[in-house]
Amino acid sequence: MEWELLADVPADALRKLLSVARRRTFAKNEVVFHRGDPADSLQLISKGHFSVQIATPLGDIATLSVRGPGDAFGELALLSRESVRSATVTAIEPGETHSVYRDDFERLRREYPSVNDVLIGILAEHLRRLSEQLIEAHYVPANRRVLRRLREMAELYRGSANSVVVPLTQEDIAGLAGTSRATVNRVLRQEERRGTIELRRAKTVVLELDELSRRAR
């Protein structure tokens, strides 16, 4: 398994880092950590998908992102000893991660100064995501944001089959798109009538990913 976050880490440093990482397995719907928990480790995903969620001021649960194999979460734990988890992360299906604890990472930084590039990459990625979200929120209509998030999730879950099952609720998609469930339902119903998707209980089947991608531009 390769992780984009660690792509620039020297091979010998990467081997050492993974040798001290601790393998963890999670059942479907098992919580990895809650928002506000002490943050002490980076989680590298090797199997399964994980939702990153927060509670809104109104008490609703908003899904901020979904991460899959080759991705990671909990990156901010490597930046500060005083940090706490900024969101709750839950396994969408059975999954596996490799935990890199901050103390182990600090020792590796001292031995391999080039590992500092990982921290720079973390900050750069967070800034990129925040910038994209801000631009979309101001300039991209809600219906297109819904289609873009559905396309991204379909690409994340895509296998060898022609159709792609996205096991997320409409509330999840609303959180990802920064809009209401009613808007998501309206947009998805329109797409179902066009034949690009099929709606099922707590999931969406993408039948025409190329067409969905074209409409999401």
Label every model-predicted segment.
Residues 153-217:
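Phosphate-/nucleic-acid-contacting segments
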Residues 5, 30-93:
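Cyclic nucleotide-binding regulatory domains
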Residues 9, 45, 68, 92, ...:
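A conserved hydrophobic position in a structured secondary element of the catalytic/binding core
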Residues 1-28, 77-79, 111:
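Cyclic nucleotide-binding regulatory module and flanking cytosolic helices
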Residues 92, 110-178:
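Polybasic "coupling" helices that flank or enter modular domains
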Residues 6, 64, 97-100, 165, ...:
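A residue-level structural signature of the nucleotidyltransferase/glycosyltransferase Rossmann-like core
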Residues 14, 65-124, 128:
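Cyclic-nucleotide recognition modules
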